[in-house]
């Protein structure tokens, strides 16, 4: 009788082997989850289609009971170079992590910018806090006449010819957000005409309408 009991114990051991096999299956499922992370990295590869500009990186400190805790902030502008742009602000203990957070926030703030022949439809001014940015259309070949923070936003938005001037605060955060406010305020000739109840010819130059009819708008 003791012998069969040992064989029964051996059978139980076999069942335990099956359980370990099940554990192997679970490990396989964890590997599948890893595949999900690979898909996430694939999405990260798709981000190469976007233009990312780090405008400024600052080190900040928080005073706590035990001393100071340092971290980094990053102001990032992201666009596709074809009329879509957004700005984000990230904060983390390491610079790469702060930039990554800024990029993700910028993508959540994407919006479309009206363009005609690589420039803006009309002059406009944007304000944010003490920062003021003035933008004016320019003829083809002029280039982007702008300072660092303004240039980063305009180039990410796909604007190739524009004149700009920054007034007031020289803080990069204020300047970037003032530029974003200016771009958000841009309107197409059709939108202005509809708001005023006038024909399009009465609110836009003939050359602008010809360029728009030629299919060079965005």
Curated annotation (Swiss-Prot):
Biased composition (Basic and acidic residues): 26-46
GO molecular function: rRNA binding; structural constituent of ribosome
Keywords for this protein: Ribonucleoprotein, Ribosomal protein, RNA-binding, rRNA-binding
Record carries keyword Cytoplasm: no
Iron-sulfur listed as a keyword: no
Subunit structure, interactors included: Part of the 30S ribosomal subunit. Contacts proteins S4 and S8.
PANTHER family: MITOCHONDRIAL RIBOSOMAL PROTEIN S5
Stated role: With S4 and S12 plays an important role in translational accuracy. Located at the back of the 30S subunit body where it stabilizes the conformation of the head with respect to the body.
Family: Belongs to the universal ribosomal protein uS5 family.
Protein name stated in the entry: Small ribosomal subunit protein uS5
Lineage of origin: Bacteria, Bacillati, Actinomycetota, Actinomycetes, Kineosporiales
């Amino acid at each position: 009788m003791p012998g069969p009991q040992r064989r029964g114990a051996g059978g139980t051991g076999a069942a335990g082997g099956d359980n370990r096999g099940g554990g192997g299956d679970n490990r396989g499922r964890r590997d599948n989850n890893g595949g999900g992370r690979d898909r996430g990295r694939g999405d990260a590869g798709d981000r190469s289609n976007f233009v990312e500009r780090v405008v400024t990186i600052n080190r900040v400190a928080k005073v706590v009971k035990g001393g100071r805790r340092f971290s980094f902030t990053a102001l990032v502008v992201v666009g596709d170079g074809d009329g879509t742009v957004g700005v984000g602000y990230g904060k983390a203990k390491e610079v790469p992590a702060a930039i990554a957070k800024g990029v993700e926030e910028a993508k959540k703030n994407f919006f479309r910018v009206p363009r005609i022949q690589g420039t803006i439809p009309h002059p406009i001014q944007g304000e944010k806090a003490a920062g003021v940015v003035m933008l004016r259309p320019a003829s083809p070949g002029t280039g982007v006449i702008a300072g660092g923070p303004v240039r980063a936003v305009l180039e990410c938005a796909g604007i190739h010819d524009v004149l700009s001037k920054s007034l007031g605060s020289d803080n990069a955060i204020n300047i970037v957000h003032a530029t974003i406010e200016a771009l958000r305020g841009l309107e197409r000739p059709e939108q202005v005409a509809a708001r005023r109840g006038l024909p399009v010819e009465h609110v836009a130059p003939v050359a602008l309408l010809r360029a728009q009819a030629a299919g060079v708008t965005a």
